[in-house]
Amino acid sequence: MIIGIGSDLIDITRIAKVIERHGERFLDRIFTETERARAGRRDKQPNLVAATYAKRFAAKEACSKALGTGIRQGVWWRDMGVVNLPGGRPTMALTGGAKARLDALTPAGMIAQIDLSITDEWPLAQAFVVISAIPATAS
């Protein structure tokens, strides 16, 4: 059962300009340590760094839309982070207000599954999030 769907499209150059202007203050406010570490591995190529951050920014926007809140009502930027599953597939890890909202949306006896697709083609980055409720399996 689909709980929510969200999408976002962003101009990578916009994120690059914000990083150039606000630097660490912006990065600390928006991105998790995991996301910053991933972008840091691309530090020799500024366009890749900006694209990495832009995709994650778009993913947070898309996830907040799928949660039905946007970035408000207790759902904040660092409550949502892009992580990779063991096979490399991206998903969202939620904490704080975002996790509380997800828990409130998930019906009893179900668990939430977040599917994420992120891509970029200069100068755009795009993200789609589908949040589904799937039956909990007996342990």
Swiss-Prot record:
Residues that coordinate or bind Mg(2+): D8, E61
Record keyword Transcription regulation present: no
Cofactor(s), names only, from the UniProt record: Mg(2+)
Alphabetical GO biological process terms: fatty acid biosynthetic process
Key words of the record: Cytoplasm, Fatty acid biosynthesis, Fatty acid metabolism, Lipid biosynthesis, Lipid metabolism, Magnesium, Metal-binding, Transferase
Places the protein is found: Cytoplasm
InterPro entries for this protein: 4-PPantetheinyl_Trfase_dom (IPR008278), 4-PPantetheinyl_Trfase_dom_sf (IPR037143), ACPS (IPR002582), Ppantetheine-prot_Trfase_dom (IPR004568)
Gene Ontology molecular functions: holo-[acyl-carrier-protein] synthase activity; magnesium ion binding
Record-linked SUPFAM superfamilies: 4'-phosphopantetheinyl transferase
Enzyme class, spelled out: transferase
Family per similarity comment: Belongs to the P-Pant transferase superfamily. AcpS family.
Protein name: Holo-[acyl-carrier-protein] synthase
